[in-house]
């Protein structure tokens, strides 16, 4: 099927300023995840996945530990999730996920990014129906039948499974994340996941070209500069 999920390893920050932003975003997400689901990764699979991802993206251990210690202590900021949808340059579809302690500020900041790119921020549900909310796992392997059988035996609802270039990619509904990860860890003897995330995967792609490409890249850069923005999903193809 060749679903166009976003492997954020490819766009890992390169400069110190960009790294600082990445660390800040991870710190906020780890703190929020640990505070809501518990600080023990063995009992909080979402936290375990997040910590694995942070380590792969070379987030320093002291940044990770500080966020967990902060969650242990209670108190602190209360971050809420916020999600914004709309149409970006070239009429591509965009979803912006945020963690914020001030929703009014965050909405204003995100809307400004849309306006500067001559894009249109919409109401809830504007483009969401054109994305699948998926758990995605990518790991080394070539026996997709054995993987599929193990997932079915674990009563996991598999949306899709692909095998290409010595890697297997598994898609499940986001609600199946925990069961799927446990089953995959068992059948692969704890293989390392190249991708282990919950994402919004577009059902179709929108081709953009010409000036729209430059505007779109600036649009993504503006969103990435916002501390409250955690993830941006889109269906632009160029």
Curated annotation (Swiss-Prot):
This is Probable transcriptional regulatory protein Sde_1551. HAMAP family: Transcrip_reg_TACO1 (MF_00693). InterPro entries: Integrase-like_N, TACO1_YebC-like_2nd/3rd_dom, TACO1_YebC_N, Transcrip_reg_TACO1-like, Transcrip_reg_TACO1-like_dom3, YebC-like. Keywords: Cytoplasm, DNA-binding, Transcription, Transcription regulation. It comes from the Bacteria. Pfam families: TACO1_YebC_N, Transcrip_reg. One of its GO terms (biological process) is regulation of DNA-templated transcription. Its main location: cytoplasm. GO terms for molecular function: DNA binding. Belongs to the TACO1 family. It comes from Saccharophagus degradans (strain 2-40 / ATCC 43961 / DSM 17024). It is found in: Cytoplasm.
